[in-house]
Every structure is written in structure tokens, then in C-alpha cells.
Amino acid sequence: MIIKSSNYAVSAVREDQYPKDNLPEIALSGRSNVGKSSLINTLLNRKNLARTSSQPGKTQTLNFYLINDEFYLVDVPGYGYARVSQKKRQEFGEMIQDYLETRPNLKGLVILIDSRHEPTKDDIAMYNYAQYLNLPILVVCTKIDKIKKSQVNKVMSRLKKNIDLNYDYVTVLTFSSVTKLHVAELGNWIEEKISK
């Protein structure tokens, strides 16, 4: 996928704030601080389009980025952030659920999982939920550059132990924003989904 243009479009917390142009969308989800903003910036070859932060819980809205005037990448608030109040977490959950369940132009979900850790209960719940919605899923194991090469197979077997990867619409990639590992494959997956 060749990126010709990429721009922040809009932030939304409810349906009437979503873009109205019916372009296809790919959503990105994962726990707080898993590297969603870094992945967006790396994929789009932009330094600060999506704001990165060492503070988890920064993204609190659905952030829509218009790519090539053809589709949107949608940055979903990170889940599992302990310092957000129970009420706020519930609001995030409802906002994400409304978006995933009601958005007809949603063509796929990228679930980011930190390759240094076991998938969390929230990661597994999001994966199962996307399966339930029959969404094409790309599981991206982020920060793979922080893992020794000899340990990469261990990361994959740990993932398979925790998540049922025998789903027809799932693809798994390792990824690094530092070394740019599998950036092209990520772009190809997105391109394939938005063209269907």
C-alpha cells in the first residue's frame, strides 16, 4: 500500500460525530500503551500524526485518520487502564461497542498485543467479541524488537495457547515500529480488506 496522504479527520464519542462519507474503515484496538499511535505513525510514515505518550490512557475518543482520501484508520481508546474510573471505563466500553456493532463501513479490526506479555483478559475478550461480530481480524504482536530472536517462537506459541487462532478471518503478524518489521504486510492486509 502506497501512502499518498494521511490526515487527522475527526474525534468522535458517538455515531452522529462519525465521518459521513461512507468510506471503508479499519479499527485499531489494544490495551493502553500497546503501541497503537506508534503503529499508525510507522504505517503512514509520519512522525507525530497520532500522538504517542508514555502515559497510558491518553486516547479517550475514537480518532479517525483519513488515508489517501480512500479510507479511515480508527484509533480506538486503549482498554485495561487502571487509573481511569469505573464509570469512564464503562463509557469507553459502550462507545467502542456501539462503534463496532453499528458501523457498516468497518472492514476489519487490528488487535494489538504486546509481544513481551501474555495476552490480557481484555485482549482475549476483544478477540472473541470481534469473532462474534464476524469481523476480519489482524492480531499484531507489537514491540517484537524488544524480544530476542530466539524467543519469537515462544511469543507465537503463548499467543496460540491463549487465543483460538482457528478462526477463518484471522491473520497474525509480529511488528516493530523501531525496525519497521512487517509494515508492508500490515499495509497489504488493510488494502485487501478495504477493497472488498
Swiss-Prot record:
Keywords noted in UniProt: Cell cycle, Cell division, GTP-binding, Magnesium, Metal-binding, Nucleotide-binding, Septation
Names of required cofactors: Mg(2+)
Keyword check for GTP-binding: yes
Pfam families hit by this protein: MMR_HSR1
Gene3D superfamilies from the UniProt entry: P-loop containing nucleotide triphosphate hydrolases
EngB-type G domain boundaries: 22-196
One Gene Ontology biological process: division septum assembly
InterPro entries in the cross-refs: G_ENGB_dom, GTP-bd, GTP-bd_ribosome_bio_YsxC, P-loop_NTPase, Small_GTP-bd
Residues involved in GTP binding: 30-37, 57-61, 75-78, 142-145, 175-177
One cellular-component annotation, GO: cytosol
Role: Necessary for normal cell division and for the maintenance of normal septation.
PANTHER family for this protein: ENGB-TYPE G DOMAIN-CONTAINING PROTEIN, MSS1/TRME-RELATED GTP-BINDING PROTEIN
Name of protein: Probable GTP-binding protein EngB
